Amino acid sequence: MKVKVQKIDGKAAGDVELDDAVFGVEPRADILHRVVTWQLENRRGTARPTRERSDVARTGAKFGRQKGSGNARHGDRGAPIFIGGGKAHGARKRDFNPSLNKKIRALGLKMALSSKAKDGLVVVDSLDLKDAKTKVLKGHFDKAGWNGKVLVIDGESVNEGFSKAAGNLPGVNVLPAMGANVYDILKHDTLVLTKDAVEKLEARFNG
């Protein structure tokens, strides 16, 4: 598919041909859901598990006689009521790192890019700014109509001047092409790709 390319200030800068194998895939909600769930699960941390009765090193021998002492009956120092005993119904370690087939991950990213190609994709020639100031960049965004949440993806690395200028703009995030992912693409209203980013993403799937 052919898409118009513009400069960061909104002026026309020609056209670019997008690979239909990457930007023309029909999105499927079930695939996108699986990939997003996998991403969010991988971001979760897990608390250190507590030690229950079977985990503590305490004697299991009865340490006092059953009757006659005037105290309660006990038979195990690992019981939760004793200092150093195991926790009753304590937190257990949970695995938040599920596996997901690489082909499914790749397909999910293609579908996310394709969904934005239908609505919300902008291609710019580069992120070079004559004046790398937040105020100037906001003016460019307003002129181009990039409202709401905007995700900007550059090539091998992010343009430093643009990154600094965009750092104070709420709802604007910048990533290198290698950092492109389904969750971030879908949660933003507008996806801005540089021509370098398009080349990197297409090479990522076709290489």
UniProtKB/Swiss-Prot annotation:
Keywords in alphabetical order: Ribonucleoprotein, Ribosomal protein, RNA-binding, rRNA-binding
GO biological process: translation
Domain of life: Bacteria
Any one GO CC term of the record: ribonucleoprotein complex
Keyword Ribonucleoprotein: yes
InterPro entries, sorted: Ribosomal_uL4, Ribosomal_uL4-like, Ribosomal_uL4_dom_sf
Residues of the signal peptide: none
GO MF term list: rRNA binding; structural constituent of ribosome
Subunit structure, interactors included: Part of the 50S ribosomal subunit.
Family: Belongs to the universal ribosomal protein uL4 family.
HAMAP family associated with the record: Ribosomal_uL4_B (MF_01328_B)
Function: One of the primary rRNA binding proteins, this protein initially binds near the 5'-end of the 23S rRNA. It is important during the early stages of 50S assembly. It makes multiple contacts with different domains of the 23S rRNA in the assembled 50S subunit and ribosome.
Protein name per its UniProtKB record: Large ribosomal subunit protein uL4
Lineage: Bacteria, Pseudomonadati, Pseudomonadota, Alphaproteobacteria, Sphingomonadales
